[in-house]
Regions:
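C-terminal catalytic histidine-bearing segment of alpha/beta-hydrolase fold enzymes
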Residues: 261-322
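A domain-start/cap signature at the N-terminus of enzymes
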Residues: 1-119, 280
Length: 322
């Protein structure tokens, strides 16, 4: 059986995924990769960027795709599937130390610069929780790029516990939830995360005036929730596509003196998410908060970035295509 390793790799100007297959056929032609999400009418092709022979193995670089779904990599007449994958790697992860402290599982990038430094807290989205301290980094590759772009910052990326059944409830139209209990970005877990940051401030490692928070989807909701868990800790927040519930909507409308910039889109898997975000930002602006901003991407703008917005795609097909 061939040894298959899988990596998340930043290439020139784009981010993709790479396979390394030992004892694969020497023939480099006819290499294809397709996804087969449950319920999909037909397999979805994924672009193969390059195929090279290196050190007795094939190196195959592709566009990004949801590697946790069902995929088939074909090299001539040979097929390889997710079930045969032996190893998952994240290029660039080595700069992040794996830590578990005071009930919080997290990755931490430490800058070489001395003295109190800024800190950026990143909260992952739904489906990327667990206890391996790698899934949230592999799925949200931006964490690696943060360390490259903001090399003078501390970058903290905790992983929340997760259970099946949380996401469907979270994605119900404007569902009521306060994320209590041990799962997701609950107030209790966020409090423990913030305690670690305050400990780093007390130790002189972090500049108390330059602590920032961002997150995507469930992590975007966690970003808003973190702003209310420890008032005054964060200098600014950037929630990306934050999940909207009555609780997070109330928090958003109450951030009258906070600096925040929300990014979201009309095309979303949660019904009317953007409507409540727009209402919340407009309420803040009407209340005099000129530091509350919103970027709302249109389908045309998303398409310009290569993001599939075809309304005929099923939800799972759209996720896989992106």
């Amino acid at each position: 059986m061939s040894n298959i390793s899988f990596s998340h790799v930043p290439f020139a100007g784009w981010t993709g995924l790479g396979f390394s297959i030992d004892h694969a056929p020497a023939e480099l032609s006819d290499v294809t990769l397709t996804l087969s999400p449950r319920g999909a009418a037909a397999p979805i092709p994924v672009a193969v960027r390059s195929v090279t022979a290196e050190g007795g193995a094939l190196k195959i670089e592709t566009d990004e795709f949801d590697y946790r779904g069902n995929w088939v990599l074909c090299i001539g007449d040979d097929k390889y599937t997710r079930a045969e994958m032996d190893e998952e790697q994240v290029e660039g992860l080595e700069v992040y130390e794996s830590r578990q402290e005071d009930g919080v599982l997290y990755r931490l990038y430490t800058p070489e610069a001395k003295g109190p430094r800024p800190l950026l807290l990143f909260l992952h989205g739904g489906g990327n929780g667990g206890d391996d301290n790698i899934t949230h980094i592999a799925a949200d590759y931006g964490v690696i790029q943060f360390a490259e772009r903001y090399s003078d910052f501390y970058i903290m990326a905790p992983q929340a516990m997760e259970r099946k059944g949380v996401l469907p409830k979270m994605n119900a139209p404007f569902a009521e939830t306060d994320q209590t209990g041990p799962y997701g970005w609950s107030r209790a877990y966020l409090g423990a995360v913030c305690d670690l940051i305050r400990k780093m401030i007390a130790e002189g490692k972090v500049d108390a005036r330059r602590v920032y928070v961002t997150g995507m989807s469930m992590g975007g909701a966690g970003t808003l929730r973190a702003m209310s868990v420890v008032a005054g800790l964060f200098a600014a927040a950037v929630p990306v596509c934050p999940s909207m519930t009555p609780e997070t909507f109330r928090i958003l409308c109450g951030l009258k003196h906070s600096k925040l910039w929300i990014a979201t889109a009309y095309v979303d898997h949660t019904i009317y998410r953007h409507k409540y975000i727009v209402d919340g930002i407009m309420a803040l602006r009407d209340a005099g908060n000129q530091n509350a901003h919103l970027t709302l991407y249109s389908p045309e703008e998303l398409a310009a970035f290569g993001i599939a917005t075809d309304p005929d795609l099923t939800l799972k097909e759209r996720f896989s295509a992106n």
